[in-house]
């Protein structure tokens, strides 16, 4: 008899964003005339940069000619894209990262889950609370946890609270942890990390033989020159960190799909016999076996991000969304609400008014304002009483949503 992976049965209810979609769909069906503004899931709204579109159109035409047609590409990504990423995103910031340490993929969400394939089942794992749900759920699916308690916390995971009291940056744990998930600029709180903060984590990881999974999906939104964009700006990070990045939010690739994972050649972890094993070799083997690479057409679009025209167009996209974040932050702050994030990040983290729970505020916002956000409790127990609003929408929708919220929830 066939059996299932019973770890899936441990997962709490539905994944956060499908549950949001279910509630919104039910409301929309009952209220077909409602003009719903979605500031929930972090999906972009503005068109792809012209440079990327033109590059992909050219690539499509190449696929129509036998002499320039491309079939299977390298599982790791084409060298011309990896080289541009290495030069522009890392070496330009003083990071010692080479092209062959960069693996192109179809999304950071996939990579942050798939990376667990190359690690053992007996690692201790730390996540912040609140946290991007994928980090937790993929560990549950892989059998790295026990059951969840009433607060949604899984046995076997080490939760590091991030709160207003610690500026939404986790404290270094007292105990030894093997795998550590960090995300800066942070999803969902919009918090950022200083070089000093990341240096403390790198020092901890090196002292304890830990590996940091560093999610830098929102690094393009950093405007403060003093803040690091990459964990590899910190001395010693090549010996303890894997970094994930994406073209989704800076270049609008949410529907086009292109991302990257950096695994330094110098990064190792222990085998069962105590010997050091190069993680680059394991990840390369994993990708070569389970992944056929990103479309040639999409990679040409991603390459165009690094052209002078592409750089200018991406910068304008990022500025547009950051201005949306500023509008959300300033409008809600002026109305008397407690607001965090929205600076150097596209997410605004709002304290729910009137003592409402996160999901109660979600429902009230949907039903009274026809605005969709994301309940903070969906990101973890420490997110209860908070709410995430995304800057990824049109200017008109953001401004209209703020007017609706302020009129119904004045401080």
Curated annotation (Swiss-Prot):
Signal sequence residues: none
Coiled coil location: none
Pathway: Amino-acid biosynthesis; L-lysine biosynthesis via DAP pathway; LL-2,6-diaminopimelate from (S)-tetrahydrodipicolinate (aminotransferase route): step 1/1
EC numbers, comma separated: 2.6.1.83
GO biological process, one term: lysine biosynthetic process via diaminopimelate, diaminopimelate-aminotransferase pathway
UniProt: pyridoxal 5'-phosphate binding residues: 72, 108-109, 132, 187, 218, 246-248, 257, 292
Top-level enzyme category: transferase
Top-level taxonomic group: Bacteria
Annotated catalysed reactions: (2S,6S)-2,6-diaminopimelate + 2-oxoglutarate = (S)-2,3,4,5-tetrahydrodipicolinate + L-glutamate + H2O + H(+)
Record PTM N6-(pyridoxal phosphate)lysine, positions in chain: 249
Positions with a binding annotation for substrate: 15, 42, 109, 132, 187, 292, 388
GO molecular function, one term: pyridoxal phosphate binding
Pfam families in alphabetical order: Aminotran_1_2 (PF00155)
Family matches, as SUPFAM superfamilies: PLP-dependent transferases
Entry keyword set: Aminotransferase, Pyridoxal phosphate, Transferase
Cofactor: pyridoxal 5'-phosphate
Family membership: Belongs to the class-I pyridoxal-phosphate-dependent aminotransferase family. LL-diaminopimelate aminotransferase subfamily.
General function of this protein: Involved in the synthesis of meso-diaminopimelate (m-DAP or DL-DAP), required for both lysine and peptidoglycan biosynthesis. Catalyzes the direct conversion of tetrahydrodipicolinate to LL-diaminopimelate.
Subunit text: Homodimer.
Listed PANTHER family: AMINOTRANSFERASE (PTHR43144)
The protein's name: LL-diaminopimelate aminotransferase
